[in-house]
Swiss-Prot record:
GO terms for molecular function: ATP binding; ATP hydrolysis activity; ATP-dependent DNA damage sensor activity; endonuclease activity; mismatched DNA binding; ribosomal large subunit binding; rRNA binding. Its EC number is 3.1.12.-, 3.6.4.-. The gene is mutS2. Pfam families: MSSS, MutS_V, Smr. It is an enzyme of class 3 (hydrolase). It comes from Thermus thermophilus (strain ATCC 27634 / DSM 579 / HB8). The keyword NAD does not apply. This is Endonuclease MutS2. Disruption phenotype: Disruption causes an increase in the frequency of recombination between perfectly matched sequences. Residues 668-743 form the Smr domain. Signal peptide: none annotated. Nuclease activity is stimulated by interaction with MutL. ATPase activity is stimulated by dsDNA.
Length: 744
């Protein structure tokens, strides 16, 4: 069987990972990535998570590995090569010091980086910043170079003095090297004035490069010292190369750097593709999973557990069934290889083996047919798969007679279920869909198809078998009705199954629309509840402020009364009791009076329809409570200030708006909408018609395949706002229009 990694396109995942590696070591590890033991894979997941939260810089490990390999082979490295290797080791040790304090999985990997201090110290002493060997590299080299410098200067002084004495004989006043010996440029016709050895001449022949006899011995001595210098430099470089080769910590350092690069590449892949860390358990449960190799892939959620071990997926061709199989297979392989997986959340079992029969794997050498190739792979599954295995089978039962293929496929599914195997299977065979419906251990599923647009949506629908849509598409494309009816008659069982599936689909869409309506209502109630809570909080705050102000007012009034009483007592004492009593009675009457109740706000009365601008909602006045108005908004009652509500113009004060409903007809055009969109429009139209007091609603849905009409009627049948519904008269739209009578 073709390697499952190839079948599931895992090498393409490796390639994406290798693109994100920064060193040859990391790229090689990425391209060789394969499933690991569980403990090691989980450690890689931990490392990837830490690399996502803690980015770090990597040294140039490729240069280090190349230099180390050459040194091991006995080569003498150049100064720059040794310097680059030393720099990489120094950066590796710095990275180790950076990661060790983290005390996590990354720090454990960093512990593998060795201590290369002896080699680094020797390199720093021997080489300068350009990689040239320094004088201090050895006493002998220092001595040789001490002799070289004055000798070189002595040669230059003699040659410049010679040129100054015979200026006419020289082309230019400069000293140059030819054959590693110092010489001067002499005009071709003046050679007799400069006795010496001809070393070279210019291309034009106008200049001769002559080594004067006066510096021959000095040049000879200089050449001898240079040979000694070169010999000592080579010895020093050879010594450094041997020190690098003998550093036993280098291989472990390279291994640690390679893994740190791979982990960083895995983190980059997870960040770029939106992957998440998987958890492991006894079942497969993926939430919003997607194919990591398909741009903008549709996300789907599904589960494989003891109740539903096998998912049987059906539906139209090119609808995404095979991609879904690969989505699960790649998620498992990526998780077992230490990668994050393509899902928002993933719980995965750890299969002992993944079996995949996907695509045409016909063997030309063995001359096997497509069907025989499938059987060969299926036989391996039946013989070897265990309850801990994962099987992925594409187009089970294809490539042979449909009846025999269906019978054989059912037997294979029964055998796999008996073994307790978990997996995904795709098929076009209707008998297999019927077999899976209600069968323990296996669940029907399908890939959704948009009949209006005639294209797949790639969305997985659990619990519902898929349809071929051949007849539905033919009807949508206006094939003659008599041909379609004859086709349905020729396939009675298939026709009944398709009709059943069509009804199930319509019911499912109606239920989805109902659920969406309830969700919107619940969301609206929650918004109202929140707004009411905020209003109550503001009210309590204002009430507390008013109480405080009232207390201060009462306190001030009491002080005033006390002052007046004191004055009256004084007056009674000095002027007589009768006048004081008269003033006391007047004071008592003043404080005994009650303020008249405030008049009701204009335009507001029980039953009046009002708008609450702060909520964007309408409600009805229930009661006037002094300075507040009790308003019914949907299922909630709330106390509001008069300025917080606005009477609607058409409302008559004191009378409910619906006391005299207008018997108008509202018409809604649903043609061209999807089923879900149409059902939302119908729900909104029913709500508006009820608020406006309409008695009738006309829904224009067209005839088409009938799926939209059936879905709408399923929703109307469940709606408590609807009294009845029927087709419009033949002259007013007939089957293409549904007339709805609303409850009063």
């Amino acid at each position: 069987m073709r390697d499952v990694l190839e079948v599931l396109e895992f090498p393409r995942v490796r390639a994406l990972l290798a693109e994100r590696a920064k060193t040859p070591l990391g790229r090689e590890l990425a391209l060789a990535l394969a499933p690991l033991p569980r403990e090691e894979a989980e450690k890689r997941h931990e490392l990837t998570g830490e690399a996502l939260s803690y980015p770090y810089a990597l040294p140039e490990a490729g240069t280090l590995r190349e230099a180390y390999g050459r040194a091991l082979a006995g080569a003498r490295l150049s100064g720059p090569e040794l310097l680059k290797a030393a720099k990489a080791l120094e950066e590796a040790m710095a990275l180790k010091e950076e990661l060790l304090p983290l005390k996590n999985a990354l720090s454990q990997v960093a512990e593998g980086i060795g201590d290369h201090t002896p080699f680094l110290e020797r390199v720093r002493k021997a080489l300068d910043e350009e990689g040239a060997v320094k004088d201090e590299a050895s006493p002998r080299l220092a001595q040789i170079r001490r002799e070289l410098r004055p000798l070189r200067q002595q040669i230059l002084d003699r040659l410049y003095a010679l040129m100054d004495r015979h200026r006419e004989a020289f082309q230019d006043r400069f000293v140059t090297l030819r054959r590693e010996r110092y010489c001067v440029p002499v005009r071709a016709g003046m050679a007799q004035k400069v006795p010496g050895i001809l070393l070279d001449e210019s291309e034009s022949g106008a200049t001769l490069f002559i080594e004067p006899f006066s510096v021959v011995k000095l040049n000879n001595r200089l050449q001898a010292l240079r040979l000694k210098e070169e010999e000592e430099v080579n010895r020093i470089l050879r010594d450094l190369s041997e020190r690098l080769a003998k550093d036993e910590g280098v291989p472990k350092t390279l291994e640690a750097l390679g893994l740190l690069d791979l982990v960083q590449a895995q983190a980059a892949l997870a960040r770029d593709l939106g992957l998440s860390r998987p958890a492991f358990g006894e079942r497969y449960e993926l939430y919003r999973a997607f194919h990591p190799l398909i741009p903008d892939a549709v996300r789907n959620s599904f589960a494989l557990d003891e109740k539903n071990r096998i998912l049987l997926i059906s539906g139209p061709n090119m609808g995404g069934k095979t991609a879904l199989l690969k989505t699960l297979g790649l998620a498992v392989l990526m998780a077992q290889s230490g990668l994050f997986v393509a899902a928002e959340k993933a719980l995965l079992a750890w299969p002992d083996r993944v079996y995949a029969d996907i695509g045409d794997e016909q063997s030309l050498q063995e001359n096997l047919s497509t069907f025989a190739g499938h059987l060969r792979r299926l036989r391996e599954m039946l013989e070897e798969a265990t309850s801990h295995s994962l099987v992925l089978i594409d187009e089970l039962g294809s490539g042979t007679d449909p009846e025999e293929g269906a019978a054989l496929s059912q037997a294979i599914l029964e055998a796999l279920l008996e073994r307790g195997v978990k997996g995904m299977v795709t098929t076009h065979l209707s008998p297999l869909k019927a077999f899976a419906q209600g069968r323990e251990g296996i669940q029907n599923a399908s890939m959704r198809f948009d009949l209006e647009a005639l294209r797949p949506t790639y969305e997985l629908v659990l619990g519902v078998p898929g349809r071929s849509y051949a007849l539905a598409i033919a009807r949508r494309l206006a094939l003659p009705e008599e041909v379609l009816k004859r086709a349905e008659a020729l396939l009675p069982e298939g026709g009944r199954l398709e009709a059943l599936l069509e009804r199930l689909e319509a019911e499912r869409l109606a239920l989805e629309a109902e659920r969406e309506r309830l969700r919107r209502e619940l969301s609206q109630v929650e918004r109202l509840r929140k707004a009411l809570a905020e209003r109550e909080a503001r009210f309590e705050e204002e009430r507390a402020e008013r109480l405080k102000a009232l207390e201060e007012e009462v306190r001030a009034e009491l002080l005033k009364v006390e002052a007046e009483l004191k004055a009256l007592k004084e007056k009674a004492r000095t002027e007589g009791k009768r006048d004081a009593l008269r003033e006391l009675m007047a004071l008592r009457e003043r404080y005994a009076k009650k303020a008249p109740p405030p008049p009701p706000p204009p335009g507001l009365a029980p039953g009046v329809l009002v708008e609450v601008p702060s909520l964007g909602k309408r409600g009805r006045v229930v009661e006037l409570r002094g300075e507040e108005v009790l308003v019914q908004v949907g299922p909630l009652k709330m106390s509001l200030k008069p300025q917080e509500v606005k009477p609607l113009p058409e409302a008559e004060p004191g009378k409910p708006l619906l006391a005299k409903p207008r018997r108008e007809v509202k018409e809604v055009d649903l043609r061209g909408l999807t089923v879900a969109e149409a059902l939302l429009e119908v729900d909104q139209a029913l709500e508006e018609a009820r608020a406006l007091g309409l008695s009738t609603l006309r829904l224009l849905h067209g005839k088409g395949t009938g799926a939209l009409r059936q879905a709408i009627r399923e929703a109307l049948r469940r709606d408590k706002r609807v009294e009845s519904f029927a087709d419009a008269p033949p002259g007013e739209g007939g089957h293409g229009v549904t007339v709805v009578a609303l409850r009063p």
